[in-house]
């Protein structure tokens, strides 16, 4: 859990903003959303495999663009 210490003379709203930013960087909200509902192991594997395929397709598309530029 991210922690933010209030600096001397610092307004509370600035500290809250720093806290929100640190939570976002730590991925707290994304983790909470992911765990909001139970996901069966088969569904989790299926989701991860689909994400891997998508990443691979994106990588191939990026490489093909990189090789076709001849200028």
From Swiss-Prot:
Top-level taxonomic group: Bacteria
Q: Name one GO cellular component term.
A: ribosome
GO terms (molecular function) for this protein are: structural constituent of ribosome
Q: Which Pfam families match?
A: Ribosomal_S21
Q: Which InterPro entries match?
A: Ribosomal_bS21, Ribosomal_bS21_CS, Ribosomal_bS21_sf
Keywords assigned by UniProt, alphabetized:
Ribonucleoprotein, Ribosomal protein
Name one process (GO BP) from the record.
Answer: translation
Assigned protein family: Belongs to the bacterial ribosomal protein bS21 family.
**The name this protein goes by in its record:** Small ribosomal subunit protein bS21
